[in-house]
Each structure stands twice: as structure tokens, then as C-alpha cells.
Amino acid sequence: DMKYVTEEFYIPEAQIPRWEYFKGSKREKRVRADGFEYFYTEGGMAFPDSLDSPSRTIITSEGGKSPDRCRHVIQDQTGRLRRLIPLELERLNMFPDNHTYHPEVSDGRRAFLMGNALVCGLVTRVGNELRARLRKREVDSTNLV
């Protein structure tokens, strides 16, 4: 819901190259303090994140404004790039809207909490399946005689 998106979530044009660097593939020669040389490599990621594909996992570093490889960035209906707001993170994890809201809790902390969460709907489905199997097991065990 765009009415909850404030300017602070939009990525300034000047920062976009830095975001592209963090999200891009790398093969960089590095040198440890002891002089050992090695190559740091990592594959590229989508930038911005696709709105038509399943989301990547939300991790605890999701909050914050600085460019980061793991933070989700989308191009919204305004055409601008932005980070996800806490409400969107809650929805991705299938929590009720504003589940993490409290006047004394920052947006960064709310994002951290969602990064530490499990997707509620999946946990519910697994729990329901376990319950059904345990009940079936109880019924089957009473028919042994």
C-alpha cells in the first residue's frame, strides 16, 4: 500500500551504482594481512528484485538504509527504486499487518524482527500435517488387537 511508503525508503539516484555493485557478480583479488592472495567471488543477484517471482528469504540485516547485498529492493509503481517497508516484510512472512508495530520500535528493528521470523503460513501447514499424522497413528495403534 503506497500510502505507507515514506521518502526514506527510496534509494537516492547517487546510491544506485553502489547498490548495483553489491548485487552484482564479483571476482576480486584480495590480500590477507599475512600477505596471502586469493579471489573473492560471488554470483550476481536480481536488481531490483522481481515482483513476479517468489521472494528471497528475509534476513536480520534487512533493515537500514545503506546499500547491502541481502536487502530487498523493488521498483514500485512510481518507477523509483526502494527498500521494502515493514508492512511488506510482515506480509511476505504471512504475519498480520502491523504485527511488529509499536510506537517505540523503529522500522529497522521491525525489519530485524521479520528477518528472525518464520513464514507463519508454512509453519501452520506443517503443524497441521503433523497433527493429522499423529492422530492417524493413534487411531491405527488402537486397531492392533
PLM regions and their residue ranges:
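C-terminal target-recognition/interaction regions appended to catalytic cores
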Residues: D1-V145
